[in-house]
Amino acid sequence: MKKLYVAAMIVGLAILFLVVNKEKTALLAPQEPENPFEEIIKQENKKEEKPKLTVAEAVSKIDRISLKENVEYLASNELEGRMSGKKGNKIAADFIKKRFEKYDLATEYDKFSIKRINPGPKNEIGDDFTQNIYTWIEGNDLVLKDEIVVIGAHMDHIGYGPSYSRYGSNRIHNGADDNASGTAALIEIAEAFAAMKGQNKRTVVIMAFSAEEMGLKGSLHYVNNPKFPKGNPDIKKHVFMLNMDMIGYLGKSKTAVFDDGSSSPDIGFIIKQLSEKYSFAKSVTLRGSGGSDHAPFYNKKIPVAFLHTGLHDYYHTPKDTADRINYDGLEKMTRYGFELAWNVCNAVERVEFDYGSFTEMDYSHDHGQKDMPLEVTP
């Protein structure tokens, strides 16, 4: 009996040893994770998200140094006055494209036909086509992203003249203020919006128009052949257009803001607030003032604002050169333009068009200045 008891004890201890040893082996054996990428995913999730920029931080990215560099190149002799259909105009478009892409923004050309009007000897040979160039940043709101805010400036000028020149000069017209200034501002505003990517509720389209000097052909082409919303383009989905044309001659405490509420009381309110912030104590409303790329949008009953610092003696002459630009003022105007567009992009409600005061704008190329003083002071 005693032998059986001892044998049973030995067998029991042996079984216990095997069980314990198996458990230890299982604990020591390498375990395959359920998801082989689980650890990588965990590490990625631990990474801190890139902090979102504030509007003030985005505004600070707009600086006079970059503006000056862009104006100087766009208004250089190399581009020969950026005449639509000519080589210099295409170089300007490619330059803008590279700048947009530098900010990781998708960019597209929109080609259209042009006809020359009374071409001079230096402008008689050129393509029958030119192009707008644009980028866009989709809105983050599931509903409002289909509402489109356009920020525009024309990139073309008048080449060598002479038919477009005030004095019939047959020399390069560099077009620094008209409109390398607005184009440089457009590039800087693209950078600011790119820095705020993912924070704009509405989709913003940033577009450099061509053939403005030939009768607003670039903007007319766009309003009749819209590209947005993507997949279902509709000009009626466009809620605001900001146009910047000749914004390089800002004087001390003065500016001119056309259509500052004449097309929309909502826009007028935003402009009033920003004008106080930027010490633009006075602005000018000229109901029905056309002559630049906002006019085709206005005639489609889209609220507009037109930033412009006035005509001057160098307008459409070979003396409109980069060294005459007020770059501190250009920086101020560009920052103002960005904040204006940003406010409209993120407004709770769509800005309303003032149908009661609608008078169709003409497309005459005088910037509506016949009734406007060239200096607007407090």
What is each model feature region?
Residues 1-4:
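Positively charged n-region of N-terminal signal peptides that target proteins for export
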Residues 25-98, 102-107, 378:
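N-terminal hydrophobic or amphipathic helices/low-complexity stretches enriched
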Residues 53-61, 77-87, 119-124, 168-179, ...:
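Second-shell loop/turn segments in exported
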Residues 61-79, 97-107, 131-207, 227:
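Catalytic-core environment of secreted peptidases
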Residues 78-81, 100, 106-107, 119, ...:
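Solvent-exposed loop/turn segments at secondary-structure junctions
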Residues 82-138:
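A non-catalytic alpha/beta surface segment that caps or lines the substrate-entry region
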Residues 126-131, 159, 170-266:
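Acidic/histidine-rich catalytic neighborhood of metal-dependent amide-processing enzymes
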Residues 249-377:
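Active-site-adjacent substrate-binding region
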